[in-house]
From Swiss-Prot:
EC number assigned by the record: 2.4.1.21
Ranges that cross the membrane: none
SUPFAM superfamilies assigned: UDP-Glycosyltransferase/glycogen phosphorylase
Gene3D superfamilies reported in the protein's UniProt record: Glycogen Phosphorylase B
Listed pathway(s): Glycan biosynthesis; glycogen biosynthesis
NCBIfam families reported for this sequence: glgA, PRK00654.1-1
Cross-referenced PANTHER family: ALPHA AMYLASE DOMAIN-CONTAINING PROTEIN, GRANULE-BOUND STARCH SYNTHASE 1, CHLOROPLASTIC/AMYLOPLASTIC
Native species: Lacticaseibacillus paracasei (strain ATCC 334 / BCRC 17002 / CCUG 31169 / CIP 107868 / KCTC 3260 / NRRL B-441)
Domain of life of the native organism: Bacteria
Function: Synthesizes alpha-1,4-glucan chains using ADP-glucose.
Protein name, UniProt field: Glycogen synthase
Length: 481
């Protein structure tokens, strides 16, 4: 049986700050169903770990590793969720904090974590065929397997895959950490290794050292090889393009199912949408909006420029003045954008409701109760929210970039094809025009809207499609493809 260790800095349902946490939970579960012995290694953030799962956590063992000439404790716990075993790396000095990231010693914290993940394999006497690393927090594992642990025979056969969920975050650290954190020399500290502009770049190291590099949509895999999206690594990615693939993320069809979702006031499916109309009224109540039949547009997102929140602010004023519509926004993010949206809410009572918060239950009620879901991201490696919205029969309005381009088929008025709306030029005027077009379809062409809604709801984004592609990747690097 193929053995895979999947490792990342976070995983739902224990803790997540974004899409990475969703993927770390859902993808291994789907790969397991393909007949793979896949296990997951994540840090044990004690303060963030949900109390309801603590009784299921078992202490497995403990050992020490060496950092800067001193022994450092590694506690190893385990928990099983469904069919998947999770290993939890425990060290209070590094992980018993109020947040997951953003600390001055993140280099030490995640350097320690990566070494602990590798060294635990001999302790538990389980050597995987593949280690699947994710984002910068674990991207140095392929480097360490060659530069630090290459002399250990069982590790020499391990192949590595690195998945890039967002190229913006790369893990830059001073060269001194090679010695103080990892205890390795500078042999790979160059442009073909992990050196960049006089610093160590963990993600670059992973790209150069991993046997396979994947990212979370085919379009994003192409985009990051260009200067516009490459975040100064486009040259490295072009050089390594032969081992770069794009695999679109999926969603958990069991969790995101309007027929069974317990967060909703009313359940429904594609054959009977009566519950969705009632969910719209329930959402209007919850967000203190008058119950009207006008189209309801929604956005659930981090309120940042990457997510296009600034573009939405610029587009909303004219759109709200000129159209009988309602808009709901849920999210937190940049303070200036939060304030801009709150100010617009004050100016357009009854039309705009803004909730500066993150509430997963409310998010799912928004997917169900809205008519349109806005995702005007400047760039979007994969995106999950547009898939969730479509599953709930809410048509996406997206910027044609990355995974948004790969998952949403824009409405074609001539053929009637499509399951959403999209725009290419990234400016507020174009977004306003596409919002007007969507409003017009809803208000004036209800049969067209209903047809697009059916297209969206039956589109299959289940993780088993992605899992099959990842399995092909594992087989490729093991020479079994």
């Amino acid at each position: 049986m193929l053995k895979v260790l999947f490792t990342a800095a976070e995983s739902a349902p224990f803790y997540k700050t974004g899409g990475l946490g969703d993927v770390t939970y859902a993808l291994p579960k789907a790969i397991k169903k393909q007949g793979v012995d896949i296990r997951v290694a994540i840090p044990f953030y004690e303060k963030k770990f949900p109390a309801k799962y603590l009784p299921k956590v078992k202490d497995l063992t403990h050992f020490t590793l060496e950092m800067d000439g001193r022994p450092v404790y590694v506690g190893l716990k385990t928990i099983k969720l469904g069919d998947v075993t999770y290993y939890l790396i425990d060290n209070r000095q590094y992980f018993d904090r109020d947040g997951l990231y953003g600390y001055w010693d993140d280099g030490g914290r995640f350097g320690y974590f990566q070494m602990a993940v590798i060294e635990m394999l001999q302790v538990i006497e389980w050597i995987p065929d593949v280690i699947h690393a994710n984002d910068w927090h674990t991207a140095f594992i392929p480097v360490l397997l060659k530069e630090k642990y290459g002399w250990i025979k069982p590790y020499q056969q391990i192949k590595t895959q690195l998945t890039i969920h967002n190229l913006q975050f790369q893990g830059w650290f001073p060269p001194s950490t090679l010695a103080t954190v990892f205890g390795i020399g500078r042999e790979g500290f160059n442009d073909d290794g992990f050196g960049q502009d006089g610093s160590i770049n963990w993600l670059k190291g992973g790209i150069n050292y991993a046997d396979l590099v994947s990212t979370v949509s085919p379009s994003y895999a192409k985009e990051i090889q260009t200067p516009a999206f490459g975040e100064h690594l486009d040259g490295t990615l072009r050089k390594q393009s032969g081992k770069l693939v794009g695999i679109l993320n999926g969603i958990d069809s069991e969790v995101y199912n309007p027929a069974t979702d317990q967060n909703l006031a009313y359940n429904y499916d594609a054959k009977n949408l009566a519950g969705k109309a009632k969910d719209k009224k329930a959402l209007q109540d919850e967000m203190h909006l008058p119950k009207r039949t006008d189209p309801l547009f929604a956005m659930v997102s981090r309120l940042t420029r990457q997510k296009g929140a600034d573009l939405l602010v610029d587009a909303l004023e004219n759109f709200l003045v000129q159209n009988n519509v309602q808009v709901v926004v849920l999210g937190t993010g940049d303070q200036d954008l939060e304030e801009d949206l709150s100010s617009l809410q004050d100016r357009f009572p009854g039309q705009l409701a803004v909730r500066i918060d993150f509430d997963e239950g409310l998010a799912q009620r928004i997917y169900a109760g809205a008519d349109y879901f806005m995702m005007p991201s400047a760039f979007e490696p994969s995106g999950l929210a547009q898939m969730m919205a479509m599953r709930y029969g809410t048509l996406p309005i997206v910027h044609e970039t990355g995974g948004l381009r790969d998952s949403v088929l824009a409405y074609n008025a001539e053929t009637g094809a499509g399951d959403g709306f999209s725009f290419w030029d990234y400016n507020a005027g174009v977004l306003t025009n596409i919002l007007r077009m969507a409003k017009s379809v809803y208000a004036d062409q209800p049969k067209v809207y209903a047809k697009l809604q059916q297209h969206a709801m039956v589109k299959d984004f289940d993780w088993h499609h992605s899992a099959a592609e990842y399995l092909k990747g594992y087989q490729r690097i093991l020479g079994k493809a």
